Amino acid sequence: MIIDFKKYSSVRIGNEFEVLVLDQICDFDGFLIGGANNLLISPKPKNIGILGDGFDFMQILDQNKDFIHLRIGCKTKSSKIYRFAKENNLKGFEYLSKIPGTLGGLLKMNAGLKGECISQNLIKIATSQGEILRENINFDYRFCPLNMPFFWAEFKLNFGFDTLKDEALKNARSNQPSGASFGSIFKNPKNDFAGRLIEAVGLKGFSKGDAMLSDKHANFLINKKNASFEDAFFLIELARKKVFEEFGINLENEVIII
């Protein structure tokens, strides 16, 4: 299928490219784009794919008065998972209200917020290389070591949706800028914040073409209208360079560039 990434990606940057649709569990030597929410696509990406609609599902495998065992397809959107958890009084997915994307992408980056992350209630993932148990996956902060396609995952959740945590997590992201963006550019370094470091080197609000390091939160890149890949990439590398020169800290990408 043909996807126009200027319309499909959250940052609204990119051209039209052929994307392979994976309708069944299989090997794929390339990159799965998911919802393209934390993605910056170059003018010449290699081998890109997307899961078929058959992997957009939520299935209850088992439940009792204490917990529920779910299988969720990796094309399922975070907003759908959040709504299901809230409507069914399930604890553990409250933070998904503020993290856009599909389950596959959430797992790939071990997405989370304020100490919560997607791997916490995980049982296993179905990959192109078979089913892999959570205890055999060395997740870390915004990191999953598995370099293969994901198709579905299973979770065990307790009952008791936490409304107080839900509100607190929503407020935690109230300072995020609006507009076309791929979310955070960089992961936060240990004991510090990427946004603070970028602001400290004078780049908050700095623009190149229609790409801008947000004047509300410096670790967000905003596409003001028609930003190019080159404009966005320039700002990312400029911020990395300036922070390293000033603080000796090498910022690590949270955005995926392909």
UniProtKB/Swiss-Prot annotation:
MF annotations from Gene Ontology: flavin adenine dinucleotide binding; UDP-N-acetylmuramate dehydrogenase activity
Swiss-Prot/TrEMBL keywords: Cell cycle, Cell division, Cell shape, Cell wall biogenesis/degradation, Cytoplasm, FAD, Flavoprotein, NADP, Oxidoreductase, Peptidoglycan synthesis
Residue runs in coiled coils: none
Pathway(s) it belongs to: Cell wall biogenesis; peptidoglycan biosynthesis
Active site positions, chain numbering: R142, S184, E254
Reaction(s) this enzyme catalyzes, per UniProt: UDP-N-acetyl-alpha-D-muramate + NADP(+) = UDP-N-acetyl-3-O-(1-carboxyvinyl)-alpha-D-glucosamine + NADPH + H(+)
InterPro entries for the chain: FAD-bd_PCMH-like_sf, FAD-bd_PCMH_sub2, MurB, MurB_C, MurB_C_sf
Cell location: Cytoplasm
Record-level GO BP terms: cell division; cell wall organization; peptidoglycan biosynthetic process; regulation of cell shape
Classification via SUPFAM superfamilies: FAD-binding/transporter-associated domain-like, Uridine diphospho-N-Acetylenolpyruvylglucosamine reductase, MurB, C-terminal domain
Cofactors (names): FAD
Pfam family, one: MurB_C
Classification via Gene3D superfamilies: 3.30.465.10, UDP-N-acetylenolpyruvoylglucosamine reductase, C-terminal domain
GO cellular component terms, A-Z: cytosol
Enzyme Commission number(s) from the entry: 1.3.1.98
Similarity comment: Belongs to the MurB family.
Function: Cell wall formation.
Protein name: UDP-N-acetylenolpyruvoylglucosamine reductase
Lineage summary: Bacteria, Pseudomonadati, Campylobacterota, Epsilonproteobacteria, Campylobacterales
Protein's gene: murB
